Regions:
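Bacterial N-terminal signal peptides that target proteins for export
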Residues: 1-9
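Low-complexity, intrinsically disordered short peptide segments enriched in small/polar/basic residues
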Residues: 2-3, 14, 36, 101
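Bacterial N-terminal signal peptides
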Residues: 8-18
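N-terminal secretory-pathway/extracellular module detecting exported/lumenal segments
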Residues: 20-136
Length: 136
């Protein structure tokens, strides 16, 4: 019996020590249709006057893109802290929730085609900008 307990302990130890893959994601809010918005501050990178971080949308129910269903989208977003603007430069849409499953669609914005959006007050995007530009 004691050996069985010790065996199970060492078998499960790596699982207990490794955090889940979504551990760094912070919930920012949700819309009335149930879409949850998250951000991963651990991906924060300074790029001159810009900050880059990963964002995620997790859908309550699947949507279609190019004839395939997706449940979540992970984006790479740039934040201009001075101008209070943002631009999504990369989007990957996944078949599963929280960025899991297979990539059903991927789109990367070319640098010359980046569209900068103003950050409006009291929005989820403003919460993202605050994490990128205001918090340490």
């Amino acid at each position: 019996m004691f050996r069985l307990v010790i065996f199970r302990f060492f078998l499960l130890l790596p699982l207990m020590m490794s955090p889940p893959s979504y551990a760094a994601w912070q919930f920012l809010g949700a819309t009335s249709d149930g879409t949850a918005y998250l951000i991963d501050p651990s991906t924060k990178k300074n790029k001159g006057q810009l900050i880059e971080m990963h964002t995620m949308q997790n859908l309550r129910s699947a949507r279609l893109v190019n004839g395939q269903k997706f449940r979540s989208a992970v984006g790479q977003t740039l934040y201009n802290c001075t101008d209070k603007t943002s631009a999504t430069t990369l989007i990957r849409q996944f078949s599963g929730e929280l960025g899991e499953g297979k990539v059903v669609s991927s789109f990367k914005q070319k640098p010359k085609e980046i569209i900068w959006d103003a950050i409006l007050p009291n929005t989820i995007l403003e919460k993202e900008w605050q994490i990128a530009c205001v918090t340490g």
